[in-house]
Amino acid sequence: MRDWFFFPAALALVAMMVFLAIRPGIGALPSGAVAGDGANYNKIAIEGDYLHKIFAGGNAKTELVDGTDNKTLLYIEAETGALRDESELGPHFRLAADIEAQFSGMTVRITVRARPADDRGAMQIAMNYSAGRVGESGWRVFDLKPEFSDFSFDYDVPRIEGDQGVDYLGIRPVVPNKSRAVLIERITLDRTGPWKPEDPA
């Protein structure tokens, strides 16, 4: 076989093998833990296709849907009694180790922009920031409005003790009966500064 034929053919074969290897990732939606950019951790935003990083947990249903103005929304639906109290056992975002380290000992403002789903829309939404075994915010419940609105709470993230665990942000509709669903447009985590221990009484 002449070199003028062999080398271009070999190069084409290698290129095809590389393409076939990376093809499953082309166009794939983001998944896994939410991570920062390595530079600015004062504001972490989860929106658009990145809402796909949610873990359904329990028997909840989660999916991305198209909203108005070409916005990608997160749909979360659950049935009554289907979800346990722990954040990680229901719909939740897992926060990567870099965010956990950057948020340790900081006050973080969690803001979720949400509204009831068009069908079986929830009247309330519940959110919980869990820092694993060192503490959690507890479930914060908000009354939803017909239109997209921001719902926020502040949480003093405990300082890391020992080995790093995993932080979670749980988000779910409040389900008094049957099933309920919410639509999420955006989630932001704002690091507002270090919290100070309370003075002893």
Where do the model's predicted regions map?
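Trp-centered recognition loops
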Residues: 107-109, 113, 145-153, 182-184
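Extra-cytoplasmic beta-strand recognition segments
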Residues: 95-120
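Short carbohydrate-recognition loop motifs
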Residues: 66-89, 143
